[in-house]
Amino acid sequence: IVRRRILHDQAAFTRRAFEDPETVKRELIGMVRAYLGPDYDVETHFTPTYRPWRQRIAFVPAGDIFKGINAGKASIVTDEIETFTPRGIRTKSGQELEADIVITATGFNMNVLGDIDFVIDGKPLVFSYTVTYRGMMFTGMPNLLWVFGYFRASWTLRVDLLADFVCRLLAHMEKKGAKRVEVALRPEDKDMELLPWIDPENFNPGYLMRSMHLLPKRGSKPEWAHTQDYWREK
C-alpha cells in the first residue's frame, strides 16, 4: 500500500509538472522562500533555468538544508568553477572557496556499456546505430539486455521489471530450445521515425545531452519506445 501510494504521488506530481510547469515552479520556489525568509537571494541560488522535472529535483527531508543555511552551518555559492587552487576552488567571478574536500557531483560524462567494442559475427556493432526494443534490448545485438532504470522514480523499480522479463524470456527460450534471441525491425517498421534515446523536452540534464550521440535510438511505435513510465511498462 505504501509503495503504491508513493508511486501514485510521484506520478501525479510529475504529470502536473509537465501540464502546468510555471505553477509548480512557483510553488516549489515559494516553499524555499518560506524556509529561508525574504532577505535570502532565492532568485540566484534556488531558481533553475529549466522547468520542474526536466532535470532531477532534489528532495529535502524536513527542510534540513534550509535549516542549516539559516543556522549558518551551510552556505550556497552559485557560480562556475574556473580552476582549483592550493586552498580550494576559484570561481569565474573571482571568488575563492576554501575547501578541505571537493566532491564532484555534476559535469561528468556518461560511460555507455563500459565503452565495450562489440563485434557480432566478425562485424563491429556501433551501439548508437541500434534501435531499442522497449528501452532494454537492441537491434543487431543478440543475447543482451541493458538494465536501465527510471529517471524520476526508484532505479530499482525498473530493474525489478527487467529481471522478471529476463526470467520469463529464458524460460521461453529453454522451452523452444533456443540459444539466441535478437530483436529486429519488422518490414512495417523500416520507415518509422527514429528518435533520440530520451526526448530533450522530457528530460535534459547536461550529462545526458552530452552523451546522446552514444546512445541507441528509439522508434515512434510503442514496441520501440522507451517510455520511462512504470505503470505503462508494468
Residue ranges and their predicted role:
Residues 1-63, 137, 200-234:
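Flavin (FAD/FMN)-binding glycine-rich loop and adjacent Rossmann-like elements that form
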Residues 5, 132, 143-234:
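C-terminal, flexible cofactor-proximal segment of oxidoreductases
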Residues 18-174:
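Flavin (primarily FAD) cofactor-binding/catalytic cores of flavoenzymes
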